[in-house]
Structures are given as C-alpha cells and as structure tokens.
C-alpha cells in the first residue's frame, strides 16, 4: 500500500506550481485498459477545472514527492454536477431509485453527482492502491459537497466489463438495462 495524498487540481492551479510540470506528470499517467482516462487527464482536466465544469482530484504518490521530488499521479477521479433523465423509467423504478423524493412520479430529470472519471495508473497495482480506496476518496469529496448543497444520488457511466468486475460489487445499479450508443451502462447509487 502506498502513502498518498489527495490534492484537488484547483488547489494546484491556484498556487504557484509550474503548470508544465503538472502537464508532464499527466502525460506520464498510463492506463492501457481505459485510454480515455489518459486523454482526459492530458487534454481536459485543466480546462474542466478552469470552467468549473468538473473537479478533478489527484491521488499523488507521497513517497515519490517527498523522497524524489517527483510529482506522480497514482490515480485520479473527476466529479461534477449532473442532471439525469428519468422520463423513461417506470413508476416502480423511480420509487426504488428515489424513495420518498417529493413529486418523484412526475419528474423527468433529477439532479445528481457524476463520477466522470475514476482510475489508477498502470504503474500501481490494486494491492498498492485499490479501486475501493480510490472510490472511497471520491465518496469523501462528494460527501463534502452534499453537506453543503444536498443531493443523494451518484451516477457513473462505465463499460460492461467494469460493471461486472467492479461497480456491481460496490453497490451500483443499472439505471437502464441496455448499453448506451457509446457502449456504456449508466449506473446509480444512493449516497
């Protein structure tokens, strides 16, 4: 298990860090199974942060930072606000998903938190930094927002294999049984 520190990207950008060093660390992040994670970190994380569209949290290898002075992204997650379309859900599914939410049967959409990205660098094993640890850090960040603005629904989109291997075991349920046009399941979880 590695020693790590979770640092919101916004805090790094607001301080006098060398943005080129941060961008270089992003380029060194590798996730061969989900190259979307690599692309997002390199191309979109900073613009999303600057526009407040989504907030990225970096899980930094603290030992490499202290001992080698090297900024290494071991994992990261991005969270955002979202509105999810529930107009096609049955009344039963809405009740199951929303419980006693006021006016739930007539709602067409509902606010939620979105995990837009969540992943670990290939340089780290699941024993060094587990998916559960990353997810727990994500839950913690969302819980801070939920205490301020409310909300109790979490959404994530994932490939079929990740639903079977990870998210189903973590209590996520399919919003729709079929895959989207992009080949993704939309999953939800109450928080």
Indicate where each model-derived feature is located.
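Non-catalytic substrate-recognition and accessory regions of acyl/acetyltransferase enzymes
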Residues: 1-126, 133-155, 159, 164-191
């Amino acid at each position: 298990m590695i020693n790590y520190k979770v640092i919101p990207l916004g805090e790094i950008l607001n301080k006098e860090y060398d943005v080129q060093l941060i961008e270089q660390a992003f380029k060194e992040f590798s996730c061969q199974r989900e190259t979307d994670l690599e692309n997002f970190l390199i191309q979109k994380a900073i613009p999303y942060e600057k526009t407040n569209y989504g907030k990225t949290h970096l899980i930094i290898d603290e030992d490499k930072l202290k001992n080698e002075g090297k900024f290494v992204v071991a994992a990261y997650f991005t969270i955002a606000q979202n509105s999810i379309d529930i107009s096609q859900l049955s009344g039963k599914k809405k009740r199951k998903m929303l419980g006693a939410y006021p006016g739930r049967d007539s709602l067409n959409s509902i606010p939620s938190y979105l995990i837009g990205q969540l992943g670990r660098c290939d340089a780290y094993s699941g024993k060094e930094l587990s998916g559960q640890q990353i997810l727990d850090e994500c839950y913690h960040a969302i819980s801070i927002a939920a205490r301020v603005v409310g909300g109790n629904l979490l959404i994530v989109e994932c490939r079929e294999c990740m639903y079977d291997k990870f998210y189903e075991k973590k209590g996520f349920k399919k919003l729709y049984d079929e895959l989207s046009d992009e080949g993704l399941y939309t999953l939800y979880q109450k928080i």
